[in-house]
Regions:
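Cap/lid segment of the alpha/beta-hydrolase catalytic domain
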Residues: 70-142
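Primarily recognizes the serine-hydrolase "nucleophile elbow" in alpha/beta-hydrolase
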Residues: 145-208
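N-terminal cap/lid segment of alpha/beta-hydrolase-fold proteins
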Residues: 14-61
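Alpha/beta-hydrolase
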Residues: 68-71, 188
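Short, solvent-exposed loop/turn and secondary-structure capping segments
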Residues: 55, 78-82, 105-109, 174-175, ...
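C-terminal catalytic histidine-bearing segment of alpha/beta-hydrolase fold enzymes
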Residues: 256-289
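The feature captures the conserved acid-bearing segment of alpha/beta-hydrolase catalytic domains
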Residues: 184, 193-266
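Loop/turn elements at helix/coil->beta-strand transitions in domains of secreted/extracellular proteins
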Residues: 63-67, 90-94, 156-160, 179-184, ...
């Protein structure tokens, strides 16, 4: 609750619905997906003119489960169309979400009294919005919460999985700790704990190291919280030949401690894999399995 209060100034997640729902939205890039009934385009308005545009891929034949695919700083979820195709073909509803300011999301111009007019185009600019009462980290999590408010009841979702690549992988480590509606999280090339960030490039992403946030709960505690619960699981996959980031197996340093803590709590699973089957920064066939 302390984390939720930090983000929203409340003791609970947002209860509201998307501000706009466009049913049967047309995007020709996805016209060849098998088992696709339609795309619903969701718009979620937030403070400081920020918007999140989300695609909900509804299958013809549903299995009652939802996969949220969260893209990283590469932009649009079209980059992982193979992942969307894979799960849609198996009857999963699929939600495509992008990081703040990327893909179809808004890039507002903010007139700061202290700094002048600045167009927000890069996530590392978001810290400029920080005040004692407002924390821009919420922009990373609020779209998921609001989208789930609509989708879970409207489409009779029984189980929800969160899959994220890169920046989306970081989101996958953090968000399930805030929202127990996420049963399984699969983070690909997501993040290392702060004490294992050994290079200048490990500190490139503002959201990874906000001191006030991680003093409430550090990464090791997020691993536990996002794994904890009946039939809940957090899985991390790191690519040995990743061309972007976190191409290491440093999880071996803390993995046993997290598993020991979960054993003492009595429920929850934490797993890690080192994928050497693919060279690049994406979800491999091994990862999809």
């Amino acid at each position: 609750q302390e984390l939720i209060h930090y983000l929203w100034g409340s003791n609970e997640l947002p209860k509201r619905m998307p501000d706009k729902i466009e049913n049967n939205f047309k995007d020709s890039r996805y016209s060849n997906l098998k088992n696709l009934k339609q795309i619903n385009r969701l718009t979620i308005d937030m403070e400081h003119q920020m918007k999140s545009i989300i695609y909900f891929f509804e299958p013809n034949e549903k299995n009652g489960k939802l996969v949220i695919y969260h893209e990283g700083h590469g932009g649009d979820w079209i980059r992982e169309i193979d992942t969307i195709r894979h799960f849609l073909g198996k009857g999963y509803c699929v939600l495509g979400i992008a990081m703040p300011l990327l893909a179809f999301n808004e890039n507002p111009v903010i007139d700061f009294p202290e700094f002048g007019k600045i167009k927000l185009e890069f996530h590392n600019q978001l810290h400029l919005l920080e005040t004692d009462e407002f924390h821009p980290l919420k922009f990373y999590f609020e779209p998921i919460a609001v989208a789930l408010n609509y989708i879970i009841d409207e489409f009779n979702i029984e189980r929800t999985y969160l899959i994220g690549l890169s920046g989306g992988g970081w989101t996958t480590i953090i968000y399930p700790a805030l929202d127990e509606r996420i049963s399984h999280g699969y983070s690909i090339a997501g993040a290392n704990p702060i004490f294992l960030r050994l290079d200048e490039t490990d500190y490139f992403d503002y959201e990874h190291t906000v001191p006030e946030f991680y003093r409430i709960a550090n990464y090791e505690e997020f691993y536990v919280m996002s794994s904890f619960g009946e039939k809940r699981k957090l899985v991390q996959i790191f690519n040995k030949w990743d061309t972007c980031c976190f191409s290491n197996d440093l999880y071996k340093i803390y993995e046993a401690d997290i598993k020991k803590k979960l054993t003492s709590l009595g429920k929850g699973t934490f797993e890690n894999y080192f994928d050497d089957t693919y060279r690049g920064h994406k979800i491999s066939k091994f990862g999809l399995k």
